[in-house]
Amino acid sequence: MSLQRPNGNSSSSSSHKKHKTEESDEELLMVPDMEAAGSTCVLSSSADDGVNNPELDQTQNGVSTAKRRRGRNPVDKEYRSLKRLLRNRVSAQQARERKKVYVSDLESRANELQNNNDQLEEKISTLTNENTMLRKMLINTRPKTDDNH
């Protein structure tokens, strides 16, 4: 009963690689969780050798080396680093997209505020001119008082 490792050499993995190039971007970003499969593959493949294995003996004595060696397996390390790298790439791309949306919102808001400011300045100028004109009219329409009276 031998199980293959996650990136073991087989004809199915080569056909999987061909199929993987045809997948969409969304499918490429999804990473299957193979951590448990990788650790069981190591134990079951070593059990098939028929050789007295100290790891297998310790496991039979009740000491679980699978959990202890789980992080040390080079296949698992490579898988985890690739998985982390993929997550980081996706996260960075999402952050860039959020930043683009944020910056474009800021730019449109700045344009709106600038237009509003221009309109208000024009209104201030118009009202100031009107106020000045009305004051002059008020002065001209007042009856002149004679001091000689």
From Swiss-Prot:
Residues where Phosphoserine is found: S24
Molecular-function annotations in GO: DNA-binding transcription factor activity; DNA-binding transcription factor activity, RNA polymerase II-specific; transcription cis-regulatory region binding
Localization of this protein: Nucleus
InterPro entries recorded: bZIP (IPR004827), bZIP_sf (IPR046347), Hac1/HY5 (IPR044280)
Biased composition (Polar residues): 55-64
Record's GO cellular component terms: nucleus
Region of interest (Basic motif), ranges: 80-100
Leucine-zipper: region residues: 106-134
Modification after translation, per record: Ubiquitinated by COP1. Ubiquitination takes place in darkness and leads to its subsequent degradation, thereby preventing the activation of photomorphogenesis signals.
Limits of the bZIP domain: 78-141
Pfam families, per database record: bZIP_1
GO process terms (BP): positive regulation of transcription by RNA polymerase II; red, far-red light phototransduction; response to UV-B
Interaction with COP1, as annotated region: 23-36
Segments for region (Disordered): 1-77
Keywords linked to the UniProt accession: Activator, DNA-binding, Nucleus, Phosphoprotein, Phytochrome signaling pathway, Transcription, Transcription regulation, Ubl conjugation
Quaternary structure (record): Heterodimer; heterodimerizes with HY5 via the leucine-zipper domains. Interacts with COP1 WD40 domain. Interacts with BBX24/STO and BBX25/STH.
Family per similarity comment: Belongs to the bZIP family.
Protein function: Transcription factor that promotes photomorphogenesis in light. Acts downstream of the light receptor network and directly affects transcription of light-induced genes. Specifically involved in the blue light specific pathway, suggesting that it participates in transmission of cryptochromes (CRY1 and CRY2) signals to downstream responses. In darkness, its degradation prevents the activation of light-induced genes.
Full protein name: Transcription factor HY5-like
Gene giving rise to this polypeptide: HYH
